[in-house]
């Protein structure tokens, strides 16, 4: 017959072991994502290929009926059977730096990871006056993006994208980063001014000083009209016996007739 003290001791020991197990802190999260407004435990698990049991294990105490938008949720812990070579297909936050690639997957630099489905994602804290963007692709680094555009410095890139970190440790695949701000090195205001076409006015609309000699029309002035005093005397030099003081031939004829009559 088992004694009562032995039974009590076994119960106390079992309860102590359970309490010790529950008191163990969770292992560090190796990979986490930020929940969007419409995300749920089921949607995150489906998008990342994570089972509900694993999701609940890595996020103890989570309320799947009300995920908090903007809060991070763990998708891979240090004790995960996924391990460092796991291939999670959606990758909104898989960094492309060598450190992050080793942490999450060895395939990040080969281009096998694709962007997470959904709307375009931008890094937090991006410059509010950003006009130009670049989608982070596999193999990208902050310096390679600067070298690609050759229109801004690395310090400017860090200023426009503070979320990437001081050493570009948080450059996430599938996210857009700012590569130009309003009034910046490669903004439209810095483009050379457009060259307006030459004037399309016809020669008749241009002033004479603007027209070339070949374009100026020939003079259209009417022939000069000399006053009567300067006209030739051919009309006055008529037939003989015409009065030299006569101005009109008909009157001269009349005068001659009158003189002849007189």
Swiss-Prot record:
Keywords from the named record: Chitin-binding, Glycoprotein, Repeat, Secreted, Signal, Virulence
Biased composition (Low complexity): 197-214, 227-240
Record-linked InterPro entries: LysM1-like (IPR052210), LysM_dom (IPR018392), LysM_dom_sf (IPR036779)
Domain annotation LysM: ranges: 31-75, 132-179
Signal peptide location: 1-22
Compositional bias of kind Pro residues: 215-226
Bilayer-spanning residue ranges: none
Cross-referenced PROSITE patterns: LYSM
Keyword Repeat (UniProt): yes
Subcellular location: Secreted
Gene Ontology CC entries for this record: extracellular region
Region listing for Disordered, in residue ranges: 85-112, 184-240
GO molecular function, one term: chitin binding
Function noted in UniProt: Might have a role in sequestration of chitin oligosaccharides (breakdown products of fungal cell walls that are released during invasion and act as triggers of host immunity) to dampen host defense.
The record's note on its domains: The LysM domains bind chitin and potentially related carbohydrates, and might be involved in damping host defense.
Stated name of the protein: LysM domain-containing protein ARB_03438
Protein source organism: Arthroderma benhamiae (strain ATCC MYA-4681 / CBS 112371)
Higher taxonomy: Eukaryota, Fungi, Dikarya, Ascomycota, Pezizomycotina
